[in-house]
């Protein structure tokens, strides 16, 4: 979801995939994404780019769609250049873009609570340089357990900053090479980003710790 100057993504590791609440929330998010995509497409059409919603939906998985699928459609139909990911994408679909529509999903706070309630480990994804420490401190107070310090968009300096921050706050570190980028010049995906093996062990240990606390009956 969005905050004043940045977009916030919460990852959920070890979520119970059979949870009825999970599927209820996913259905809500899917509907919200489709409504947002339809509004973005209306704005793009006003700019001379007529892109059918059905085509965009066909580029997503199981009905989920968003700006990355819209941008892929723009590229496929000749409305954007694939080598201008942060030019054309930001111009039309970025937070200050001509066709941008604010995302109305779970708030970061609700997302953290939801992941924990679903038996998972909530982690802040690729915070970059735009998310203020004070905001993250608030999420920690709610139950945030980690930060994705290793990410293709993070410079070495940014990664070091978040490694230091997580250590000082007792958080776990995670990493990901990402899978939803559509730019051919950015090699994202499995195996494209070195991440220490120890991260998996620490993540699993944190999940087991959370699970044991949640399963302990109160006196």
Predicted feature locations:
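Short, function-defining helix-loop hinge/capping sites that tune catalysis or transport
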Residues: 134, 184-186
């Amino acid at each position: 979801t969005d905050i004043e100057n940045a977009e916030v993504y919460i990852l959920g590791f070890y979520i119970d995939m059979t949870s009825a609440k999970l599927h209820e929330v996913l259905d809500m998010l899917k509907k919200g994404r489709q409504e947002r995509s339809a509004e973005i497409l209306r704005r793009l059409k006003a700019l001379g780019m007529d892109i059918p919603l059905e085509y965009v939906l066909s580029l997503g998985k199981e009905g989920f769609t968003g700006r990355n699928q819209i941008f892929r459609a723009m590229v496929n139909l000749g409305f954007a250049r694939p080598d201008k990911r942060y030019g054309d994408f930001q111009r039309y679909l970025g937070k200050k873009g001509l066709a941008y529509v604010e995302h109305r999903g779970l708030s970061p706070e609700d997302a953290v609570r939801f992941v924990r309630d679903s038996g998972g480990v909530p982690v802040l994804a690729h915070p970059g340089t735009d998310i203020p420490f004070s905001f993250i401190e608030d999420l920690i107070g709610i139950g945030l357990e980690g930060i994705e310090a290793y990410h293709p968009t993070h410079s070495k300096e940014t990664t070091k900053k978040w490694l230091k921050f997580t250590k000082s706050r007792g958080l776990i570190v995670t990493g990901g090479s990402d899978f939803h980028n559509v730019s051919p010049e950015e090699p994202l995906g499995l195996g494209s980003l070195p991440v220490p093996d120890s991260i998996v062990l620490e993540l699993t240990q944190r999940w087991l710790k959370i699970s044991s606390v949640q399963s302990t009956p109160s006196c």
